[in-house]
Amino acid sequence: MFSSILRKVFGSRNDRLLKKLRKNVDAINALEAEFEKLSDEALKAKTDEFKARIEKGEALDNILVEAFATVREASKRVYGMRHFDVQMLGGQVLHEGKISEMRTGEGKTLTATLPTYLNALSGKGVHVVTVNDYLARRDAEWSNQLFTFLGMRVGCNIPGMSPEQKRDAYQADVTYGTNNEFGFDYLRDNMAFSPQDRVQRPLNYAVVDEVDSILIDEARTPLIISGQAEDSSELYRRINTIIPKLVQQEKEDEEGQEGDGDYTIDLKAKQIHLTERGQLHVEEILHEESLLPEGESLFAAGNISLLHHINAALRAHKLFSKDVDYIVKEDQIVIVDEHTGRTMEGRRWSEGLHQAVEAKEGVRIQNENQTLASITFQNYFRLYNKLAGMTGTADTEAFEFNHIYGLETVVIPTNRPMQRKDMPDLIYLTAEEKYEAIVEDIKACVKRGQPTLVGTVSIENSELISRILKKSKIPHKVLNAKFHEHEADIVAQAGKPGAVTIATNMAGRGTDIVLGGNWQAELEKIENPTESQIEKVKAAWKESHDAVLAAGGLHIIGTERHESRRIDNQLRGRSGRQGDPGSSRFYLSLDDALMRIFASEKMGNMMKRLGMERGEAIEHPWVTRAIENAQRKVEGRNFDIRKQLLEYDDVANDQRKVIYEQRNELLDEGDISETIAVIREDVVSSVVDEYIPPQSLEEMWDVSGLEERMRADFAVDLPIKTWLENDDKLYEEKLRERILNEVVDAYKQKEAVVGEQVLRQFEKAVMLQNLDSHWKEHLAAMDHLRQGIHLRGYAQKNPKQEYKRESFALFSEMLEALKVEVITILARVKVQAEEDVQKVEEQRRQADDVPKNFEHEDATAAPEEASDQVRTQVREGAKVGRNDPCPCGSGKKYKQCHGKLK
């Protein structure tokens, strides 16, 4: 209450920021008349003028007012579109490296041209990041006209381009592309075979469109480049036949009472576990199939791979559903993004899950993958000097943006007041009743000529509603990942009178639904249209537009609540753009996923006791509030998962930075002999210390062992015993120095034979080849460490601290092993001529040329530390769970009834 009084007196931080930015908007508006008088040439010349001023040391902030005025005037001449004052506010927020929340239809694409132009003047490049290839291409083509007019070049970075095309796109002043492609290019550059293979410039400034989708929804899933490992497709097929023989058990085994099922499912955590009975049953089947030797346990150390296959197959069959989590397309499993409903072509699940799904669906099984490089979006986007974002729904996640990315969210007011009417949710007992009510609502909209957008959470649901509408003979269009090629056409006409469009939650996002339909799309169908044809199309559109306005604008129907309030708000936000009228309503049932998890059995019993008849619904603000509270819980849990993923990845990120920095230095250096000399001294000293411990008695020295080791590792025959017999003053330091000198002399002799240039090339090739192979193995070791680290919680240890400690130890061991291997190879290998160097280079290139997968994998952070162990209690009869119905028959939960007495 006190804070709300303070806000009324002093205004919120958001209000104060906007008030400050409005001063610049007034200054830009004051320049408008002056800039209107400039010729096209004079306006274009402004770009060179600004660049010259920046080169002399002038700050971008000092040029902002004139640069924004230049872009506004250029836009008027190129597109006939003038930036509104609210777009000027949004542009300034983006330039300051903040998130600009602008409602759907407020012109985010046009707003982005302002800070993009200003920051591109520095010559360091600007990246505009979009959610898919279609939007990247569309926005690049659209903005190209404006930037070309202003003397700048636009590039587009999409999958499938050659390195030359990518390099050209990155050299442009402004580069449009998808988040995945920018991230993969960064990883590829750090795996480059030579400096010429790199495509990116240093990361300068990024404007992220639909920033919530990219930095939050997709932040739980790291980008991974992987190569294929050994073929185990036959084993996947055989394990696949075992799963249908297993039976699900509803509850986990309890003390003294074992269930009769083989596995249990945890829907919230999306996990599946074998019961004790299930383990024995699986072992029995594996013995019969000759996959497990008689008398051996599934959990024996040698059978870890078999257990891994069983778990993957169980998850594939019981947790992943066709047309919800994936689709089958051209003999391949294509993942469906749970957040956007789009297909993720070329992406694969890790840990053998993808192969298990392939076996389940009977398509060709592709080999398992080995991680070659990986990064999370959190750590990739934090590499930019300045990061900004825009979306229609960021305010609900403002804390996360600030906490993880250091980005402040500024809510920009709408150009015209919002007129959309958001109606309370309707809740039905069953899904069948819910769909009947939805169809009735659609029929009413069609009858009055009101366009309808029906939002679903999965492809399966969108196709179910489509089938129901077909039965009712209602014409409609379906927009989901299966038909994303026609996305723009469907969205363009979704605002026509009486049009019905079914879309998975975020399909079509980024394209406005214009009331009355899109007249420009109609015009494109006519070849070389005449003036009269253009006028005819515009007149027809005006008639449709007015009819839709009279019918109430676009009506949004939500068929289910999403886990996140933000995604529900995005669906609502498709209606009511630019002050247009509109309406929205969500239809729910107790069968919905969110309601199954969070709505208690009590609510269902209460609805039945109220004597609700078929087709009746509950409509009350309390219910809507309860659902939003449930969504808040899920959002909080998802935030914790993302935060935890980041905390674990930060450990790997520090190591990644060190390796990538070293690797890039090696690539750019022509001569690394000084580095090799330093490493050689370290390695020789370590070897000597093993056999002659520092500050030890001569009796403790293993001289013959040291002689043998020097012969084996460094290919030098050193009579160390003779040296010691002949020289009484030859102690540790002097001996170490003499051994090192002998190793260096032997290497110099090799250099004299082979030639300095050849040896320098050989050193670089060996160093890079070994760095890459050791880093690859280290990533696999880190993966394995990560998968089991949560078990340390049972030993009362903090898994995060343990992970940090052990990963540091692994990293140190990897660096030591790398040093030893490089020096011993250089010492032992006989380099005859340049052909030998080329052989090593060829090996490196072959290792680099293996087929790679570019994956945006599902990842879950390692579970938090386990709770403290508690004393075991002996109980008579089965345990009653706190959330189970009370055995007394009251219908209440146990914790609310007799459980209160405990």
From Swiss-Prot:
GO CC, sorted alphabetically, is:
cell envelope Sec protein transport complex; cytosol; plasma membrane
Q: Which domain of life is it from?
A: Bacteria
Q: What residues bind Zn(2+), as annotated?
A: 886, 888, 897-898
Q: Tell me the Pfam families matching this sequence.
A: P-loop_SecA, SEC-C, SecA_DEAD, SecA_PP_bind, SecA_SW
Bias kind Basic and acidic residues: ranges? 840-859, 873-882
GO molecular-function terms, A-Z: ATP binding; metal ion binding; protein-exporting ATPase activity
- What membrane topology does the UniProt entry give? Peripheral membrane protein
Q: Which reaction does it catalyse?
A: ATP + H2O + cellular proteinSide 1 = ADP + phosphate + cellular proteinSide 2
Q: Which UniProt keywords apply?
A: ATP-binding, Cell inner membrane, Cell membrane, Cytoplasm, Membrane, Metal-binding, Nucleotide-binding, Protein transport, Translocase, Translocation, Transport, Zinc
Annotated region Disordered: where?
565-584, 840-902
According to its UniProt record, where is this protein located?
Cell inner membrane; Cytoplasm
Cited PROSITE patterns = SECA, SECA_MOTOR_DEAD
Enzyme Commission number(s):
7.4.2.8
Q: Does the keyword Metal-binding apply?
A: yes
Q: What does the cofactor field's note say?
A: May bind 1 zinc ion per subunit.
Q: Which cofactor does it need?
A: Zn(2+)
What residue stretch is flagged as signal peptide?
Answer: none
Q: Where does ATP bind?
A: 87, 105-109, 512
The UniProt entry lists the main location of this chain as: membrane
> Which residues lie in Basic residues bias regions?
892-902
Q: Which GO terms describe its biological process?
A: intracellular protein transmembrane transport; protein import; protein targeting; protein transport by the Sec complex
Q: How does it associate, per the subunit comment?
A: Monomer and homodimer. Part of the essential Sec protein translocation apparatus which comprises SecA, SecYEG and auxiliary proteins SecDF-YajC and YidC.
Function of the protein: Part of the Sec protein translocase complex. Interacts with the SecYEG preprotein conducting channel. Has a central role in coupling the hydrolysis of ATP to the transfer of proteins into and across the cell membrane, serving both as a receptor for the preprotein-SecB complex and as an ATP-driven molecular motor driving the stepwise translocation of polypeptide chains across the membrane.
Record family assignment: Belongs to the SecA family.
Q: What is this protein's record name?
A: Protein translocase subunit SecA
Where does this protein come from, organism-wise?
Alteromonas mediterranea (strain DSM 17117 / CIP 110805 / LMG 28347 / Deep ecotype)
Q: Which gene encodes it?
A: secA
